[in-house]
């Protein structure tokens, strides 16, 4: 079968088109996986580009590789500049007798969270501060319309001093003190000064297990754990807000609450602290 190898340099390139070309899409609706393309061509390319795009994401100084051989298709961005930081990403398909296994990863280091949030429409979820994140997923794939069903992995993020829009913490604490459930939208008219934000999650079959989420703002420490479904966006999270005493710095027990509803319409239900 034919083989193609070499090095290509571009001024500007659409990386989304390359990733689509290396993805095993087939069927009448483009939902089933057609892996026969890995049997028809051997490919080994080194790519570089001064500028590049992948959907809404703009990158510069891109170095990437594309490989196809029997039973394997790989696209790796080994280095790129994005959101005023560095970015690496990869997409891999391993084809075996038992099926197709997909692996994907994204690692961003020392990026501008505000720029990331604006680009992806996540200004309320991503702080305006410097930070890093890592996403790794792997698992069997049968159809594109159910691509996430078998994927498992981790997502973690760490952001430093900055701000988080859409959070009025004093109003939130007052509502939890008053009792009765309320919509998070009711206490979203504010901007929260942020000292740091740390997030660690485990992903299994369309569920995000929030193992640890901690936000520190001045004397307040907000913690969350629980489940988030990214099919439907359902929420089941337990949280607390502790306040450190000014003289000792020790955190005193504070508000406890449950977060339910969905990502688009979360609600808060205050919880009674155990005696």
Please annotate each region the language model reported.
Residues 201-210, 214-221:
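Extended serine/threonine-enriched, polar tracts that run as long, contiguous segments within proteins
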């Amino acid at each position: 079968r034919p083989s193609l190898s070499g090095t290509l340099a571009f001024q500007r390139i659409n990386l989304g088109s390359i990733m689509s070309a290396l993805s095993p899409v087939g069927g009448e609706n483009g939902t089933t996986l057609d892996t026969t393309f890995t049997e028809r061509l051997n490919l080994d390319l080194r790519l570089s580009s001064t500028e590049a795009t992948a959907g809404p994401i703009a990158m510069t100084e891109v170095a990437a590789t594309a490989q196809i051989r029997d039973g394997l298709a790989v696209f790796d961005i080994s280095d790129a500049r994005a959101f005023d930081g560095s970015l690496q990403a990869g997409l891999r398909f391993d084809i075996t007798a038992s099926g197709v296994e997909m692996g994907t990863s994204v690692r961003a280091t020392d990026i501008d969270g505000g720029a990331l949030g604006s680009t992806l429409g996540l200004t309320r979820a991503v702080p305006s501060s410097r930070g890093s994140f890592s996403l790794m997923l792997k698992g069997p794939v049968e159809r594109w319309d159910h691509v996430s069903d078998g994927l498992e992995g981790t997502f973690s993020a760490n952001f430093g001093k900055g701000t988080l829009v859409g959070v009025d913490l004093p109003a939130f604490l007052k509502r939890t003190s008053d009792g009765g459930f309320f919509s998070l939208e009711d206490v979203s008219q504010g901007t929260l000064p942020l000292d740091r934000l740390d997030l660690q999650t485990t992903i299994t079959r369309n569920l995000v297990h929030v193992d640890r989420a901690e936000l520190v703002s001045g004397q307040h420490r907000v913690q969350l754990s629980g489940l988030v479904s990214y099919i439907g966006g359902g929420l089941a999270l337990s949280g607390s807000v502790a306040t450190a005493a000014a003289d000792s710095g020790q955190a005193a027990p504070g508000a406890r609450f449950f977060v339910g509803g969905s990502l688009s319409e979360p609600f808060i239900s205050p919880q009674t602290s155990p005696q």
